[in-house]
């Protein structure tokens, strides 16, 4: 009606990366008329730390060696993105889908560390608490002790492991004391 034709096109979204695409539709047996439109494949709850490739690569320091980080950091933006995707692709528990659960969880932990452990002196994912949270996830239990003498102590409990942090400033800065 009114010169419009509607068509449903099955687009397998699970195979598209988080980016913008152009879709061009040509009418068959016409004067080569074409309609072009942009669409975006969007990861709605993408961790913010993945918005910066530099940050995303830097945060790998908790799970890989410096040589790998140097390799991922070299090259053009496109090459670095490809190498970054390849790095996580090798670790993807569901490689036939675009969504990588392991990568998503890792960078959610990076975001959490930024939001919860950042102080005036330290970005949260660079803090001792941030590092432990990124590596091990949320602790099973957190206990905070306020001794009458000495600094506040926070104990994070994981299966078969405890991490003890000691306050250094009274403003949320904690340093790993023992594990």
Stretches with model-predicted labels:
Residues 26-30:
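Beta-strand-rich extracellular modules
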């Amino acid at each position: 009606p009114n010169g419009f034709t509607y068509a449903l096109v099955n687009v397998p979204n699970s195979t598209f990366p988080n980016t913008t695409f152009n879709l061009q539709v040509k009418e068959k047996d016409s004067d080569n008329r074409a309609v072009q439109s942009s669409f975006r494949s969007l990861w709605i709850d993408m961790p913010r730390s993945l918005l910066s490739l530099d940050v995303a690569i830097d945060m790998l320091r908790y799970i890989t060696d410096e040589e790998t980080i140097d390799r991922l950091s070299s090259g053009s933006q496109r090459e670095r993105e490809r190498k970054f995707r390849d790095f996580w692709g090798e670790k993807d528990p569901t490689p036939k889908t675009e969504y990588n659960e392991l990568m998503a969880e890792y960078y959610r932990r990076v975001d959490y560390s930024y939001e919860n452990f950042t102080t005036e002196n330290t970005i949260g994912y660079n803090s001792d608490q941030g590092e432990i949270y990124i590596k091990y996830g949320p602790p099973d239990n957190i206990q905070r002790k306020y001794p009458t003498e000495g600094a506040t102590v926070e104990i994070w409990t994981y299966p078969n492991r405890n991490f003890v942090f000691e306050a250094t400033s009274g403003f949320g800065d904690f340093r790993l004391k023992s594990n």
